[in-house]
Amino acid sequence: MTINDSAISEQGMCEEEQVARIAWFYYHDGLTQSEISDRLGLTRLKVSRLLEKGHQSGIIRVQINSRFEGCLEYETQLRRQFSLQHVRVIPGLADADVGGRLGIGAAHMLMSLLQPQQMLAIGFGEATMNTLQRLSGFISSQQIRLVTLSGGVGSYMTGIGQLNAACSVNIIPAPLRASSADIARTLKNENCVKDVLLAAQAADVAIVGIGAVSQQDDATIIRSGYISQGEQLMIGRKGAVGDILGYFFDAKGDVVTDIKIHNELIGLPLSSLKTIPVRVGVAGGENKAEAIAAAMKGGYINALVTDQDTAAAILRS
């Protein structure tokens, strides 16, 4: 019996990956076939058949003989070390579009998490927009409601622009960063802004990107013009390693104080983000490892989608 490695399932996995994950959960984590079927969204009969197919094809022997084995090991370690609810580590491929593959992985995670008519809160950035582009059909068919976590309408259009016109999208009608703290306070007190922020905090699931100070001018927040290179250098000197939604935090996950941009942002603060039940972070690149680890330490995300090399770097840090 051979493994079909070309067909992709509704869960976004080829058959070999399904077999590898089932084997890992069954033999390594001690889950029952019923528990595995719930976790992967498969029938119990399908789990049983794939387990048998794994034995007959040679994937399952004394150890899991699959290129996905390393990813599963990283997922287990990340889940335990950072108390994550959900983890997906994407296998590394030479010359592959990592951002696109992370978007696919994050989209499939969200499809497994979201129930019809639930609300998804979205942060800005390339990773989240990649994800949103791959969710358009699901969002429409399941009537998922969207709400932005920050101002800056233009930052969301590459993802929102791909959606069906009938989709429910609640956008904060304000810039991401105001020209002063006073103007930011005034805008946040406007009902049209306040109502969207309250809706965002009440979301069922959130997805955010994670920026790293070490990215320098490659960081989305710089490329989008929200901060200058000089500001980023000053922020780094204050101990910041990364940011989510423009809020910077240190290696322990604590928000860095006395940073000018924090008072000028129009968006959900990280303390409020933490009240959303499921918070998915999607980020890749070894230069982001410290920032991703800090985001998990701070509790800003409790689910992660990343690539194999980044996962290894996080666990080394």
Swiss-Prot record:
Belongs to the SorC transcriptional regulatory family. The keyword Protein biosynthesis does not apply. GO terms for molecular function: carbohydrate binding; DNA binding. Pfam families: Sugar-bind. This is Transcriptional regulator LsrR. GO terms for cellular component: cytoplasm. It is found in: Cytoplasm. Residues 33-56 bind DNA. Keywords: Cytoplasm, DNA-binding, Repressor, Transcription, Transcription regulation. SUPFAM superfamilies: NagB/RpiA/CoA transferase-like. Signal peptide: none annotated. Transcriptional regulator that represses the expression of the lsr operon in the absence of the quorum-sensing signaling molecule autoinducer 2 (AI-2). It also represses the expression of the lsrRK operon. Acts by binding directly to the lsrA and lsrR promoter regions. In the presence of phosphorylated autoinducer-2 (phospho-AI-2), LsrR is inactivated, leading to the transcription of the genes. It comes from Escherichia coli O139:H28 (strain E24377A / ETEC). Its main location: cytoplasm. Inactivated by phosphorylated autoinducer-2 (phospho-AI-2). Phospho-AI-2 acts by binding to LsrR, which is then unable to bind to the promoter regions, allowing the transcription of the target genes. Coiled coil: none annotated.
